[in-house]
């Protein structure tokens, strides 16, 4: 399975619509690179992870959207999400949850608008740093 190709199929048209560039980080992670931010989508045995990358003063920061969502979501917001068996279903479920949890802020993220109250910075791997920083700096 090629995770990059799967995401490319799922989000066909997003690159042009939101002026983003889909970039492969590794076999299990891709990023949509915008003008001064990137939205990472990772795949693991635990499911799909969503990350927000921001370049401030030449320092790349990474934030887990999952951690923010888990704190903010209620049982009602998760209602109607069916168990997923394919990458497509998993990503779509995450995006539905993201839309509900952030009151449609996912679309804002795709346009480069930031969410407030980030306090959960995560470790940025060297691979993420080199690929995403290069992508952000060349835009």
Q: Language-model segments: what does each one mean?
A:
Residues 1-10, 22-139:
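Intrinsically disordered, low-complexity regulatory regions enriched in serine/threonine/proline
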